[in-house]
Amino acid sequence: MRERAKLYIDKRVDQSDGSILEIVIWKLPNPTAERPHGYKYRLNYSLPDGTTLVRYDNETGKGDHLHIRAKEYPYTFTTPEQVIIDFINDIKNNEGQL
């Protein structure tokens, strides 16, 4: 029987201003070439219309990266805890520009 990914965290918060904060992290059964750290993740802070303000993800074919509005930057994933800290810090640090 093939091992399945295990949900590490799945959290969504609908903010009073209508923005959405979502954190989803999966622990993969085994590391892969694209995800050598063994995690698949999506951390997203967006407007109600879906416009991305801050997003961290490792979508297939792109590897670890982050988005601040429409700009994309490389990201070095270390741990699930650290990616959450980095995500929250980017929201706070870019607050006036988002």
Question: What are the residue ranges of the model-derived segments?
Answer:
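The feature represents the first ordered module of a protein
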Residues: 1-65
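Short, compact, well-ordered microdomains
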Residues: 71-98
